[in-house]
Swiss-Prot record:
It holds the Pfam family Snf7. This is Charged multivesicular body protein 4b. It is found in: Cytoplasm, Cytosol; Late endosome membrane; Midbody. InterPro entries: Snf7_fam. Belongs to the SNF7 family. It is a peripheral membrane protein. One of its GO terms (biological process) is late endosome to vacuole transport via multivesicular body sorting pathway. Keywords: Coiled coil, Cytoplasm, Endosome, Membrane, Protein transport, Transport. The keyword Acetylation does not apply.
Length: 227
């Protein structure tokens, strides 16, 4: 492909640019410019084809010679248009291939750069020293776990008690509390009640209720007599 690019952009075998072709970015840009130019040419030819077709229809049987000339020009334009379509396809394929190659080149460059950086980072590392460091870390972690376990164990500091004696004392306290509660329930203190006021309650509400009941009975008797 480098030979093709050299011929395309004027780098001859013995010329000044021999051995140094254009950059991928420059070649891609020129291919895009060529595509744009050919696309404009396509639009121009399509308009010319429409114009010649309209002229052929206009003349028709009235001016057969003019109609035939218009159709011939239309055919030439169509042939040029087909050639441009093929050229555009070729240029598009070449541009995409060049873009992919350029992308791959950039990717490889970046990967090589990262590999060098990783190598530089590992230059001061020794696998034996790393193993020793990890072993020291494991030992220190084990020691820390042992210290934590020792600290968390309860220490009596000489205070030893009989569990049975403590349970017996606890039962006595519970029984005393129970007896106290029973005494409070069975023997409450007598609280003097206040004197009831000796006020006569009026009997009007009861009398009114009796009158209402008498009225209801009268209405019921009147209803029964009408039946």
């Amino acid at each position: 492909m480098s030979g093709i690019l050299g011929k395309l952009f004027g780098a001859g075998a013995g010329g000044k640019g021999a051995g140094k072709g254009p950059s991928p970015q420059e070649a891609i840009q020129r291919l895009r410019d060529t595509e744009e130019m050919l696309s404009k040419k396509q639009e121009f030819l399509e308009k010319k084809i429409e114009q010649e077709l309209a002229a052929a229809r206009k003349h028709g049987t009235k001016n057969k010679r003019a109609a035939l000339q218009a159709l011939k020009r239309k055919k030439r334009y169509e042939k040029q248009l087909a050639q441009i379509d093929g050229t555009l396809s070729t240029i598009e394929f070449q541009r995409e291939a060049l873009e992919n190659a350029n992308t791959n080149t950039e990717v490889l460059k970046n990967m090589g750069f990262a590999a060098k950086a990783m190598k530089a980072a590992h230059d001061n590392m020794d696998i034996d020293k790393v193993d020793e460091l990890m072993q020291d870390i494991a030992e220190q972690q084990e020691l820390a776990d042992e210290i934590s376990t020792a600290i968390s164990k309860p220490v009596g500091f000489g205070e030893e008690f009989d569990e049975d004696e403590l349970m017996a004392e606890l039962e006595e306290l519970e029984q005393e509390e129970l007896d106290k509660n029973l005494l409070e329930i069975s023997g409450p203190e007598t609280v003097p009640l206040p004197n009831v006021p000796s006020i006569s309650i009026p009997s009007k509400p009861a009398k009114k209720k009796e009158e209402e009941e008498d009225d209801d009975m009268k209405e019921l008797e009147a209803w029964a007599g009408n039946m």
